[in-house]
Amino acid sequence: MQNRYIVFDVETPNRWNNRISAIGISVVENGRIIDNYYSLVDPEQPFDRFNSMLTGINEETVFDAPCFPEIWEEIEPLMSSGILVAHNAGFDMGVLRKCLSAYEIAWRPTVRGICTVIMGRSLLPGISHRLNDMCDYYGICLNHHQADSDSRACAEILIRYMEGG
């Protein structure tokens, strides 16, 4: 069984959810976070006010940031090196798929991913599984809607789940 998890989180610039304005990645091996990656991304699309207020990311923030194809060239080996994990994975995986498609990049994960929301509902029924609530439950520091903090927090939650909840 593979014991390498690539935990990631994306932030989006607008309601279309087909571009990425920031990505955070935390690598978990043998029950420990062994590496972290973060980058702002120029989405080459306008920002919605709501998304900018939520994430603190806007056109000025990403002015010198690389576009997604440049980032992808750097992170694809990492994203292909383990089981993908995200909190509310349907959203993050969906955004990643749409972004890859928008740039005509052919890539598919080698194995099905893991959603820590779904995992948590089976391990800890009857409580809220929103990221901030799970961080409160486990005492994990979180700067919510910051891709690097969200990916690290999700990785910590995954580790707690693997330890037995």
Which residue stretches match the model-derived regions?
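Short leucine-rich amphipathic alpha-helical surface patches
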Residues: 120-124, 139, 162
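Short secondary-structure boundary/hinge segments and terminal tails
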Residues: 70, 118, 151-153
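Conserved non-catalytic scaffold segment of RNase H-like nuclease domains
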Residues: 1-111, 125-145
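Acidic two-metal-ion nuclease catalytic site recognized across multiple nuclease folds
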Residues: 1-3, 155-165
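Buried hydrophobic packing segments
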Residues: 96, 119, 154-158
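A charged, well-structured terminal subsegment
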Residues: 144-160
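Conserved beta-strand -> loop -> alpha-helix junction used to position metal-binding or nucleic-acid-contacting
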Residues: 108-120
